[in-house]
Amino acid sequence: MTENGFRVEADLLGKRSIPDDAYYGVHTLRAKENFDISGRTIASLPYLVMALAAVKEAAADANCELGLLPRPYRDAIAAACVEIREGRLHDQFVVDVIQGGAGTSTNMNANEVICNRALELMGHARGQYEYLHPNEHVNLAQSTNDVYPTAIRVATCFALEHLLEAMARLRDAFAERADAFAGLLKLGRTQLQDAVPMTLGQEFSTYAVMLTEDIARLQEAGWLIREINLGATAIGTGITAHPQYAEKALAALRRITGLDLSTAPNLIEATQDCGAFVQVSGVLKRIAVKLSKICNDLRLLSSGPRAGFGEINLPPVQAGSSIMPGKVNPVIPEVVNQVAFEVFGNDLTVTFAAEAGQLQLNAFEPVIASALFRSFSHLTAACTTLAQRCVSGITANPERLRETMERSVALATALNPYIGYKRATAVAAEAHATGKSIREVVLERQWMTDAQVDEALRPEALIRPRVL
């Protein structure tokens, strides 16, 4: 019954007025009022909203196949879920991402939105739950405790694939620059001190390899997250569900999502354990560590332009100072550094929340989901931004690379096989003290011939193993 643009819905706490145009109901309204915490609603996590709809559609399919849900109910529920999976009605998911209750508010938000849209499709008004009910039908044979973690895992799979794509593009950008810089000899450094020669191409190919390795680690974590507890219901015993429900719901969810999901071998363990989230978050932290290290290098190698390393140029994307004319800052690597710092904190949040579970349930999966999806989203954006607005436009300064190479006393290392470590040390010390080149000092001491020095300092001999 509606009046003045509102309908009345009731729960165990009493009656409340719900806006007529709202697809959510009384449970969602109370949760919206209770959890004004982060300013981020479930709608800000589109993968989670789509995953919730996929789980509800799979449940309806399974229950219908088992004869527990009439076909017209199943069809209306499934149609509503398809609309949500296609991006509609996301604005109706209004509960804060961070909430008490182990995700019950999120589950009920989904139940009510799906139910009210299904009612419309059946020719009824929103809130006419005598024809289709959020709990009795949309949530049939389900608990928040299997729906919510399953939805998080499915959403994580979606987010993971997009991050993998962004990482692959960044890896390819570094590999392309490595090819372009393959012939540019430069000085390597350890502990910020002159070390031995390498090519700029080798330096950039290292970044591509780092990303390749982390892509593999993320793919491995993705297999772990594909194990779900749908059918566990409240604590893993499967109470209120048909004996074949878990199997049929899994098959439906695999079909709907296209994911290679599996049911956990022990549903009681799977319902209370958050180890898979810890594992995935740890891999995200590893990726963030690598990205931040790479960006530290890019900032250092491009420092200057006249009083720093100045070996590479980052593409200028904006003016760098409100007071210093002409200054350009490495803003893209800097923003990636900051994303990494955020991911480190998110990983700690996941760790604490996973540890805080008690007995048969972890009540803190909402903050785990919040932290995980923020890390996924920001890392994906960071990889894309770094590839498109920085790495693809990096250029080298060959003259600067040559200058630092020729002036470095570290070239004395290449003399070890010819004159031994002791004499090579003496050559390096004299070159450093006098400003002479390594070539000049070793020839003056007559410890090597011109031909031997040429061979020792030949670029190809400086950057890879060889037999003398």
Predicted regions and their residues:
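Conserved, well-structured ligand/cofactor-binding cores
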Residues: M1-L468
